[in-house]
């Protein structure tokens, strides 16, 4: 079987470097999740607060 790539790269780094990479990846993940939730909330808020138009013809009149 193929060896685990993360383990191969980790073997070339010190414990402190590995911890630093792990923390950085964790905070990037938290940032991504936070932005996703924020954008979803903003879009949902805008969709709920905007009037719903049933068809483009009604929008013109």
Curated annotation (Swiss-Prot):
Output this protein's name.
ERMES regulator 1
Regarding protein family, the annotation reads:
Belongs to the EMR1 family.
Q: What happens when the gene is disrupted?
A: Decreases the number of ER-mitochondria encounter structure (ERMES) foci in cells. Abnormal mitochondrial organization within cells, manifesting as fragmented or aggregated mitochondria, spherical mitochondria, or absence of mitochondria. Decreases the level of phosphatidylethanolamine (PE) in cells. Decreases growth on glucose (fermentable) and glycerol (non-fermentable) carbon sources. Simultaneous disruption of ept1, psd2 or psd3 leads to decreased growth on glucose carbon source.
* One Gene Ontology cellular component: cytoplasmic side of mitochondrial outer membrane
Which segments does the topology annotation call Mitochondrial intermembrane?
1-20
Q: Which UniProt keywords apply?
A: Membrane, Mitochondrion, Mitochondrion outer membrane, Transmembrane, Transmembrane helix
What Pfam families has UniProt attached to this entry?
Emr1
Task: Kindly give the membrane topology term recorded for this protein.
Answer: Single-pass type III membrane protein
Q: Which residues lie on this side of the membrane: Cytoplasmic?
A: 44-61
Q: Which residues form a coiled coil?
A: none
Q: Where does this one sit in the cell?
A: Mitochondrion outer membrane
Native organism taxonomy: Eukaryota, Fungi, Dikarya, Ascomycota, Taphrinomycotina
Q: Enumerate the transmembrane spans.
A: 21-43
Oligomeric state and interaction partners are given as: Interacts with the ER-mitochondria encounter structure (ERMES) complex. Interacts with mdm12. Interacts with mdm34.
> Which gene specifies this protein's sequence?
emr1
Q: So what does this one do?
A: Mediates the formation of endoplasmic reticulum (ER)-mitochondria encounter structure (ERMES) foci, thereby contributing to the formation of ER-mitochondrial contact sites.
The record's annotation in InterPro entries points to: Emr1
Source organism per entry reads Schizosaccharomyces pombe (strain 972 / ATCC 24843)
Which terms under GO biological process does the entry name? intermembrane phospholipid transfer; outer mitochondrial membrane organization
């Amino acid at each position: 079987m193929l060896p685990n790539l993360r383990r191969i790269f980790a073997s070339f780094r010190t414990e402190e470097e590995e911890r630093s990479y792990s923390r950085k990846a964790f905070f990037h993940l938290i940032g991504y999740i936070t932005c996703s939730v924020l954008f979803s909330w903003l879009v949902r808020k805008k969709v709920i607060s905007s009037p719903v138009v049933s068809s483009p013809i009604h929008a013109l009149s």
